């Protein structure tokens, strides 16, 4: 008569549960040893009892085998599912951007006083506060630009006034200089016409004319020469 099939479920009796644990643990450790020897496999086995006691077996080292396992899992996840991870990342980013765009569009409509029916009292109050702060900053910036423009125009006005005074002084100085030149005795020589000179004798041509009539002063000057 064959052995009956044992139902796999938690053993309620504490003593029976402990006895079964010891038997199966020893059998599991034996099979792990046989697997490592017969198949030249790297085997690591870790078992914790219900009381928290540790039982382990490794033909190499439990820590070394665990590190090897973690490395293999990391490499496979980095190489095997890169495209899948990238696709998932871009989908998440696209979804995030769509939400941001939708929120910005809703905020713009709220600022323009549209689609306010979807807001409650608290949200309307927050929107009002944000608008008041925004208007305050806009007015402050506008006044800042206005004061800067006024200051620039005042400086420009002073520069133009200084330039005007300088030009007036130059004109007055030129007029005084012209008046002084008109009063100088040497101005009578300006009415004497220029006469041509002989290139050899360096004398006016009319002085070389024998028919030229000299004044007494001129004759005396010629005699002295």
Curated annotation (Swiss-Prot):
Name assigned to this protein: Agamous-like MADS-box protein MADS1
Gene Ontology CC terms: nucleus
Disulfide bonds: none
Tissue: Expressed in flowers and seeds.
GO MF annotation terms: DNA-binding transcription factor activity, RNA polymerase II-specific; protein dimerization activity; RNA polymerase II cis-regulatory region sequence-specific DNA binding
Role noted for this protein: Probable transcription factor involved in flower development.
Signal sequence, renumbered to the chain: none
Recorded name of the encoding gene: MADS1
Annotated keywords: DNA-binding, Flowering, Nucleus, Transcription, Transcription regulation
């Amino acid at each position: 008569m064959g052995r009956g099939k044992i139902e796999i479920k938690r053993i309620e009796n504490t003593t029976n549960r402990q006895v079964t644990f010891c038997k199966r643990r020893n059998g599991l450790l034996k099979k792990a040893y046989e697997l490592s020897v017969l198949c030249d496999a790297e085997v690591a086995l870790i078992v914790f009892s219900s009381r928290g006691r540790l039982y382990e077996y490794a033909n190499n080292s439990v820590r070394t085998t665990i590190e090897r396992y973690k490395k293999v899992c990391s490499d496979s996840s980095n190489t095997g599912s890169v495209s899948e991870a990238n696709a998932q990342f871009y989908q998440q980013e696209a979804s995030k951007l769509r939400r941001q765009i939708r929120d910005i569009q809703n905020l713009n409509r709220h600022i323009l006083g549209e689609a306010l029916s979807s807001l409650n009292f608290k949200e309307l109050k927050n929107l009002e506060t944000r608008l008041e702060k925004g208007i305050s900053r806009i007015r402050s910036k506008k006044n800042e630009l206005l004061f800067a423009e006024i200051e620039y125009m005042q400086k420009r006005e002073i520069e133009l006034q200084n330039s005007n005074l300088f030009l007036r002084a130059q004109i007055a100085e030129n007029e005084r200089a012209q008046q002084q030149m008109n009063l100088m005795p040497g101005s009578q020589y300006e009415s004497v016409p220029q006469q041509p000179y002989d290139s050899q004798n360096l004398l006016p041509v009319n002085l070389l004319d024998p028919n030229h009539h000299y004044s007494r002063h001129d004759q005396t000057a010629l005699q002295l020469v």
